[in-house]
Amino acid sequence: MTAPRLISKYRIQIHRISENMVLNNDGLKEISTLLVSASDREPEVKLEKTKDNSSSDITTPPAEFIPSIFFSLHKIRKDPNNVSSQLETSTGFIRHRIKRCKALLQENEEVRNLLANSIEEWENIIADKEQQLRVKAKVLRDLDARIEKITN
């Protein structure tokens, strides 16, 4: 798969995930804005053509994290001798975002706790919370029925 297709594929997937995701934690929201596509927030910029002009212009918002990594790797694979100077500039903003995310994670204990659990652990935690909510809802329905019975 070519780099433009990878960029497009991951841009769409990340955008769909970010549209459906509601983050209640401010630290996670800030990290998400660093890593998730910024197509709604920033104008698109054109990335430069490769040396041999074999690829067409590719447009991508500057804050897209995953697609930028794939594009940089594609450039390295395509022309490993010419990318040493371009690598610094093309991945500089990626390193900057990683450093900012790391700083945010170090500052916020709650975010670290949220991200510390694995997917399986979160599935168990969510199942437990749903069970607790069902029990509480049943208690509330029983109380409502008792109140209704007493008032009638």
UniProtKB/Swiss-Prot annotation:
Belongs to the Mediator complex subunit 9 family. The gene is CSE2. It comes from Candida glabrata (strain ATCC 2001 / BCRC 20586 / JCM 3761 / NBRC 0622 / NRRL Y-65 / CBS 138) (Yeast). This is Mediator of RNA polymerase II transcription subunit 9. Component of the Mediator complex. Its main location: nucleus. One of its GO terms (biological process) is positive regulation of transcription initiation by RNA polymerase II. Component of the Mediator complex, a coactivator involved in the regulated transcription of nearly all RNA polymerase II-dependent genes. Mediator functions as a bridge to convey information from gene-specific regulatory proteins to the basal RNA polymerase II transcription machinery. Mediator is recruited to promoters by direct interactions with regulatory proteins and serves as a scaffold for the assembly of a functional preinitiation complex with RNA polymerase II and the general transcription factors. It comes from the Eukaryota. GO terms for molecular function: structural molecule activity; transcription coactivator activity. It is found in: Nucleus. One of its GO terms (cellular component) is cytosol. Residues 98-150 form a coiled coil. Keywords: Activator, Coiled coil, Nucleus, Transcription, Transcription regulation.
